Amino acid sequence: MAAEGEAKKDSASNPPGGGGGGGGGEEEEDSSLAVGEAAVGVGEAGGGGGGGEKADREEEEGKEDVEEGGVCKDLVLVEDAVPVEDPEEAAATAALQEEMKALVESVPVGAGAAFTAMQLQELEQQSRVYQYMAARVPVPTHLVFPIWKSVTGASSEGAQKYPTLMGLATLCLDFGKNPEPEPGRCRRTDGKKWRCWRNAIANEKYCERHMHRGRKRPVQLVVEDDEPDSTSGSKPASGKATEGGKKTDDKSSSSKKLAVAAPAAVEST
């Protein structure tokens, strides 16, 4: 384009018909125009090549972004609904898991090589169930649920035979929210944090020390001897005699008062 502008300026400064010098100027103009067009063509070719390379690079970068997850930015991940659990049951299961971890950690190295962590957990759970059964206390449901799930999940027959825990009434399960945490222990408390550490009597709630509380103590009856002594036998007779003498004295004194009062009344009349 710059070459065309220069050619136009030269043509304007040297109008046609200027003689031989004018003819020489036309040849120079034609050569300059050819050179300018060639330069412009080379520049366009170079620019087109550079633009093509840039386009290729942009396409490659776009492909890389797509492969790295650029498309995932437009997607919305929808998570499955989490079932809501009972907070008390979740806390009980969490406490049980912590106890299992502490039990596994307390086992010396090499001592529990015959049992795996899951087997130790199952043994501990069964021992706790046995404690409730030995104390004749209803077994909490959070201790029975894992066993029930393992039985029903092992085969289809178990699921058909025990579809729910409601049919297992003979196990005396505790469906309440406050199960007994330590079966077999005395339940005497001060209403706050303290609790008696002694073991309860069989089929009872309290230990020997706290069994008398809350019950009426029997009244002790005084039993007299059946064989009266000689001295004791004479005393009642003397007492009766004195009582009879007192009664006769009272009668005599009352009669005297009446006798004295009667003549006084006659004299006054």
Swiss-Prot record:
Lineage: superkingdom: Eukaryota
Role of this protein: Transcription activator that plays a regulatory role in gibberellin-induced stem elongation.
Keywords carried by this UniProt record: Activator, Nucleus, Transcription, Transcription regulation
Description of its domains: The QLQ domain and WRC domain may be involved in protein-protein interaction and DNA-binding, respectively.
Provide any one GO MF term from the record. Answer: ATP binding
Q: Where in the cell is it found?
A: Nucleus
An individual GO BP term:
developmental process
Biased composition, Gly residues: where in the chain?
Answer: 43-52
Q: Mainly resides where?
A: nucleus
The text of the family note is: Belongs to the GRF family.
UniProt domain QLQ: residue ranges: 114-149
UniProt region (Disordered), positions on chain: 1-71, 212-269
Q: Does the keyword Nucleus apply?
A: yes
Q: What is the protein named? A: Growth-regulating factor 11
Biased composition of type Basic and acidic residues is found at 1-11, 243-253
In what ranges is there compositional bias, type Acidic residues?
58-68
* Species of the source: Oryza sativa subsp. japonica (Rice)
The short motif Bipartite nuclear localization signal is annotated over 185-195, 213-217
**Positions with biased composition (Low complexity):** 255-269
Q: Name one GO cellular component term.
A: nucleus
Q: Where is the WRC domain?
A: 180-224
